[in-house]
């Protein structure tokens, strides 16, 4: 296979409203099967996507769907086309001083329009790829990628084929359009005034139809293992926690729970103590025995302490039970080992409260870590109302005080977003 990559020289400065296809057709000589790689900047200029530089930040805001990462003034964002890139593609290079360029509003539509017009003007069967320069995760340096395409299959799926050793290819899907964009940039460069390149010798990649454009190249945020920067992911991990009351029947990975417990025991605690214990109820039989005993204790309290009749007790205890429906339970316990003894009730109460706060911090860490593992959770206070019963059923030491129970499982539905503004909970003195 022979391959040529040719820069198309002689294209003049492009202004808004220019016939870009006409300028490209006039500047080069084309053949059937040629693939034209066109830098996005000349497309944007022809489409009038030019702003005053003073409007740059506002333009980035307008083009941004979500912020992926922020480092000082620099922003990596997802734009309306699904591209994850620096500054939403708003760029001050290769444009007049005091101006910035936006990406084409619909790069695939731009590629289709260019292809149609160029094929009319040249009489050749062509493909068009609109390119832009991106940074890359895991690696330094920039390279061009495809942001718009027409007449080209942008991906080549090798899955199911075999390599030269007979091994089946299971995951290999080649980003053909990106490979072409990067190769073409070798002759286009960044400051040479050559905005278009021809890749010749790959005519078999050119399709009769315009095709799906670059959409197949764009990984949905929900499928992206690296959808946030490190700092952003750490912040979001805390706020993503929700109380989940409905679970699937999928089993819970005990190793994931133990990783969450490892996070839980990093919580702060008084006097250099470790006041947390986590009882993991991995046996269905144990869960049922505990919940049945707790139900009996609850019914006794309603009957003997609250004076309820049997019908009212039955109605109250018949309501849905998130603990009984969960595939996994954790019973966090507080131990007061290392606490200080005080002779007066004020300081004794404060000492107990210090340890209780530490227990709560451990439970919160557990819940947040479970969210990071992909599990939903719900903290329920019920074991605190029948601690003796819980200790008896689970054979726990007398000094272990159950501090509720945590239901764990895969959420049956996506938890609803909850917005709470910090100012509603803040007083400044």
UniProtKB/Swiss-Prot annotation:
Coenzyme F420-(gamma-Glu)n binds at residue 301. SUPFAM superfamilies: CofE-like, FMN-dependent nitroreductase-like. Its cofactor is Mg(2+); Mn(2+); K(+). Residues 1-229 are annotated as: Coenzyme F420:L-glutamate ligase. InterPro entries: F420-0_g-glutamyl_ligase, F420-0_gamma-glut_ligase-dom, F420_FbiB_C, FbiB, Nitroreductase, Nitroreductase-like. Its EC number is 6.3.2.31, 6.3.2.34, 1.3.8.17. Pfam families: F420_ligase (PF01996), Nitroreductase (PF00881). It catalyses: oxidized coenzyme F420-0 + GTP + L-glutamate = oxidized coenzyme F420-1 + GDP + phosphate + H(+); oxidized coenzyme F420-0 + FMN + H(+) = dehydro coenzyme F420-0 + FMNH2; oxidized coenzyme F420-1 + GTP + L-glutamate = oxidized coenzyme F420-2 + GDP + phosphate + H(+). FMN binds at residues 269, 381, 418. A divalent metal cation 2 binds at residue 133. Keywords: GTP-binding, Ligase, Magnesium, Manganese, Metal-binding, Multifunctional enzyme, Nucleotide-binding, Oxidoreductase, Potassium. Binds 2 divalent metal cations per subunit. The ions could be magnesium and/or manganese. Monovalent cation. The ion could be potassium. A divalent metal cation 1 binds at residues 91, 132. Residues 230-429 are annotated as: Dehydro-coenzyme F420-0 reductase. GTP binds at residues 11-14, 40, 45, 94. One of its GO terms (molecular function) is oxidoreductase activity. Pathway: Cofactor biosynthesis; coenzyme F420 biosynthesis. PANTHER family: COENZYME F420:L-GLUTAMATE LIGASE, PTHR47917. Bifunctional enzyme that catalyzes the GTP-dependent successive addition of two or more gamma-linked L-glutamates to the L-lactyl phosphodiester of 7,8-didemethyl-8-hydroxy-5-deazariboflavin (F420-0) to form polyglutamated F420 derivatives, and the FMNH2-dependent reduction of dehydro-F420-0 to form F420-0. In the N-terminal section; belongs to the CofE family. This is Bifunctional F420 biosynthesis protein FbiB. It comes from Kitasatospora aureofaciens (Streptomyces aureofaciens).
